[in-house]
Structure formats: structure tokens, C-alpha cells
């Protein structure tokens, strides 16, 4: 089968011809129609997680995907052959990923795909969508809460903006002027141009009483602490990239933490329901053939990628 893989950590991804995997107990084999590209894909392939990840090579890249079940292993109860599914396929210890024609996944890493959208749309959802949903849950966002989302125009940010607004929160999203109207259509009450000056100063000028929740997907430790000036006494500040210092936040009487995602099939079911109900918009910036994955990964590494990239398989 065709697959985009690396032969060792740090090697360049290449289109390879690899053997078809076979499902074991509790596993399903999926013929993938599309795979979603996430920054974590190239970070894993580059070996950025160190000893925390044990991998077999060649390592097929990719986590997110969508397609049709073509075989099931012993003991599988949730799916049968022919079912449309979406979810997470990255299994580095077995060299498995989603940038390929056929992939094996644990049945509990998948859910029935939404019926009202394409496989390409479904493939763009799992990692970013579950991250955003868990963020909104863990920061207790609800009716009347004011939320500042930094890095709002990315995959997680656009989902978090929609989910928070859908719960009745007042969302302030960072966005360049060219993306401001888009963010408002996704539910942001207002936007802040992070290129026009310190975000904290702009937010406090408009809202001297601050925000209830800060969700930051982009700032380093110093910038993150600066942004916590916007958070009201007793509020919540969360970093997605490990910038939160719990001791410092406690000194400022803030609840805060470095977010760790907890994926589950139940979350995938919820997201599929949102898609079918029209409550979640998925912004696919580019859809390209599988063989162009190396170029798209290079663009993602440099930050040149625009919108969510999906690989058509």
C-alpha cells in the first residue's frame, strides 16, 4: 500500500510502498479516504517527544483520518465491515499512522463518521476538535463567561471559539484584520489584532474588569504571564504549549494549568453530532494528494501553512 513514512526519527518523510497491516483483537482495518495534517505529526516524526515515545520504523505519519471499515479483528463489537468512521490512527509502537491507504486502529479510537459531511471534513476534526472540546469543559466555560482565546485562528482555536460561543460565552479572539470577520462568523464577539500591540493592553482597554478565562495556544512562558493580567481574580488561565507555571498562577490567585488532551470515542461521537446538526464549521484550507504530504509538512514546520490541510487518499 502507499504510505508517507519516515525511516528513522529526524529523517525526511517519503512516499513508500509498505505491507498492508492486519487487525488484531479489538482492532479494525480502515481504508482511508482522507487524513488530517496536524503539527504533532511532524513533531513525532522528528523525535521531539524523546523517550516518551517508542516507535517502530518505517513509521507511517499522521494521527487523524476517516474512511470505511474493511475488516475487523476478534472481539470487535462497535463496528462492522462497511461502516464509515473517523478518529485517531497513530500507533508509533507499531509503526502505524494515517498517511496511508489502509490503517489499523483500536476500535475505541474511532467513532461513526458524521453523515452530512465528507470524509475530508471528518478527517480534519479528531485531534483539534477533541482538544477544543476538552478545553471548554475543563475551563468551565458557560453562559455569560468572558473568554480570551490566543491563537484563535488555528485548528484548535476555531473549534474552541465555536464551542465556547455555543455555550453562551463572550469570546474575544486574537486575529489579524484579514481573519477578523471570519472569527466573528464563528462566534467571536470581538477580535484583537495581536500584531497591533500588546494583547493584554488592548483587552484591558476595552474591558477593564478583565476576562474569566484565558486559553493560550501560542505564547511562551513570559508572554503567557503577561497575558494573565487580563484574567480576573479567581479566574482560569490555560496554556496548550506548557507555558503555565502553577506556582506563579497561584500567587496571582488564578486557577491554571498546562493542558493535556484526553481523547475518547465519546468525544468523537459528540463532535460528529455537532457536525450533523450544523453546529460546527470545519475550515479546510487545502486538500492535496497523499504524495504531496512531505511538502505540506515542510510548510507546517515553518508556519507557512494556511488553514487545515487534508490529504486525499
Question: What kind of region is each of these model predictions?
Answer:
Residues 1, 268-313:
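C-terminal hydrophobic helical "lid"/dimerization subdomain
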Residues 19-37, 49-91:
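Glycine-rich beta-strand-centered segment in the early N-terminal region that forms part
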Residues 54, 78, 88-151:
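NAD(P)H dinucleotide-binding glycine-rich loop of Rossmann-like/cofactor-binding domains
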Residues 123-196:
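Mid-domain Rossmann-like dinucleotide-binding core that forms the NAD(H)/NADP(H) cofactor-binding site
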Residues 137-141, 206-208, 229:
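Glycine-rich helix-loop-beta junction characteristic of Rossmann-like nucleotide cofactor-binding loops
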Residues 198-209:
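Short amphipathic alpha-helix with an adjacent loop that forms part of the alpha/beta core around
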Residues 218-280, 313:
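Glycine-rich phosphate-binding loop and adjacent beta-alpha segment
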Amino acid at each position: 500500500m502507499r504510505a508517507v513514512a519516515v525511516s528513522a526519527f529526524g529523517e525526511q518523510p517519503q512516499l513508500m510502498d509498505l505491507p498492508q497491516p492486519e487487525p488484531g483483537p479489538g482492532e479494525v482495518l480502515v481504508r482511508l479516504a482522507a487524513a488530517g495534517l496536524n503539527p504533532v505529526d511532524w513533531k513525532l516524526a522528528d523525535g521531539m517527544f524523546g523517550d516518551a515515545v517508542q516507535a517502530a520504523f518505517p513509521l507511517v505519519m499522521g494521527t487523524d483520518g476517516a474512511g470505511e471499515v474493511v475488516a475487523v479483528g476478534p472481539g470487535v463489537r462497535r463496528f462492522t465491515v462497511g461502516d464509515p468512521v473517523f478518529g485517531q490512527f497513530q500507533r508509533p509502537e507499531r509503526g502505524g499512522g494515517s498517511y496511508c491507504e489502509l490503517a489499523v486502529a483500536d476500535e475505541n479510537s474511532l467513532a461513526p463518521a458524521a453523515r452530512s459531511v465528507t470524509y475530508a471534513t471528518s478527517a480534519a476534526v479528531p485531534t483539534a476538535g477533541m482538544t477544543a472540546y476538552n478545553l471548554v469543559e475543563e475551563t468551565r466555560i458557560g453562559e455569560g463567561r468572558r473568554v480570551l482565546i490566543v491563537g484563535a485562528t488555528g485548528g484548535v482555536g476555531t473549534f474552541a471559539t465555536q464551542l465556547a460561543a455555543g455555550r453562551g460565552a463572550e469570546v474575544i479572539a486574537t486575529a489579524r484584520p484579514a481573519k477578523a470577520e471570519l472569527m466573528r462568523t464563528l462566534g467571536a464577539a470581538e477580535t484583537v489584532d495581536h500584531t497591533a500591540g500588546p494583547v493584554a493592553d488592548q483587552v484591558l482597554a476595552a474591558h477593564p474588569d478583565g476576562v474569566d478565562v484565558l486559553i493560550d495556544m501560542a505564547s511562551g512562558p513570559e508572554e503567557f504571564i503577561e497575558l494573565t493580567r487580563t484574567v480576573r481574580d479567581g479566574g482560569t488561565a490555560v496554556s496548550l504549549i506548557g507555558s503555565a507555571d502553577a506556582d506563579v498562577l497561584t500567587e496571582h490567585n488564578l486557577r491554571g494549568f498546562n493542558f493535556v488532551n484526553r481523547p475518547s470515542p465519546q468525544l468523537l461521537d459528540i463532535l460528529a453530532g455537532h457536525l450533523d446538526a450544523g453546529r460546527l464549521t470545519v475550515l479546510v484550507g487545502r486538500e492535496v494528494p497523499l504524495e504531496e504530504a512531505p511538502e505540506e509538512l515542510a510548510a507546517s514546520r515553518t508556519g507557512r501553512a494556511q488553514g487545515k490541510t487534508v490529504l486525499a487518499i
